[in-house]
UniProtKB/Swiss-Prot annotation:
<feature type="disulfide bond">
    <location>
        <begin position="64"/>
        <end position="111"/>
    </location>
</feature>
<keyword id="KW-0255">Endonuclease</keyword>
<keyword id="KW-0540">Nuclease</keyword>
<dbReference type="GO" id="GO:0004519">
    <property type="term" value="F:endonuclease activity"/>
</dbReference>
<feature type="disulfide bond">
    <location>
        <begin position="49"/>
        <end position="102"/>
    </location>
</feature>
<dbReference type="InterPro" id="IPR036816">
    <property type="entry name" value="RNaseA-like_dom_sf"/>
</dbReference>
<dbReference type="InterPro" id="IPR001427">
    <property type="entry name" value="RNaseA"/>
</dbReference>
<dbReference type="Pfam" id="PF00074">
    <property type="entry name" value="RnaseA"/>
</dbReference>
<dbReference type="GO" id="GO:0005576">
    <property type="term" value="C:extracellular region"/>
</dbReference>
<keyword id="KW-0732">Signal</keyword>
<feature type="active site" description="Proton acceptor">
    <location>
        <position position="34"/>
    </location>
</feature>
<feature type="signal peptide">
    <location>
        <begin position="1"/>
        <end position="23"/>
    </location>
</feature>
<keyword id="KW-0378">Hydrolase</keyword>
<dbReference type="GO" id="GO:0050830">
    <property type="term" value="P:defense response to Gram-positive bacterium"/>
</dbReference>
<feature type="disulfide bond">
    <location>
        <begin position="82"/>
        <end position="126"/>
    </location>
</feature>
<dbReference type="InterPro" id="IPR023412">
    <property type="entry name" value="RNaseA_domain"/>
</dbReference>
<dbReference type="InterPro" id="IPR023411">
    <property type="entry name" value="RNaseA_AS"/>
</dbReference>
Length: 139
């Protein structure tokens, strides 16, 4: 009986490890990829995007992420959207927040981005009561 419990515990731990390593979004991933508060200062939006995309690992291993949005608000303003929400719920803010959209304009020899700032509503996907996915923005 004890051996059976140990076996199932090992299987469960393996499954959890695999799910964490292979694409299950986490709150920490969300913060790292999309949140920049207070906004890091650069002389232009393009300079901001070129540096931030590298800093946040979106240009690693010879690949350039084609598009990313950074949100410039306290993460708690987005966390409240996901309280008591089912996993994979999509929620949109009522308020507008300052964001920067970074769009790839050249990938060779190095990744280069244009940047545009907007005030937008933010739509997030929830898991475990926290935002884990930026699903988009709207005017």
């Amino acid at each position: 009986m004890a051996m059976s419990s140990l076996w199932w515990t090992a299987i469960l731990l393996l499954a959890l490890t695999v799910s964490m390593c292979y694409g299950v979004p986490t709150y920490q991933d969300f913060l790292y990829k999309h949140m920049d508060f207070p906004k890091t200062s650069f002389p232009s939006n393009a300079a901001y995007c070129n540096v931030m995309m590298v800093r946040r690992g979106m240009t690693a291993h010879g690949r350039c992420k084609s598009f990313n949005t950074f949100v410039h608000t306290d993460p708690r303003n987005l966390n409240t959207l996901c309280i008591n929400q089912p996993d994979q719920a999509l929620r949109t803010t009522r308020r507008h927040f300052r964001i920067t959209d970074c769009k790839l304009i050249r990938s060779h020899p190095t990744c280069r981005y244009s940047g545009n700032q907007f005030n937008r509503r933010v739509r997030v996907g929830c898991r475990g009561g926290l935002p884990v996915h930026l699903d988009g923005t709207s005017p």
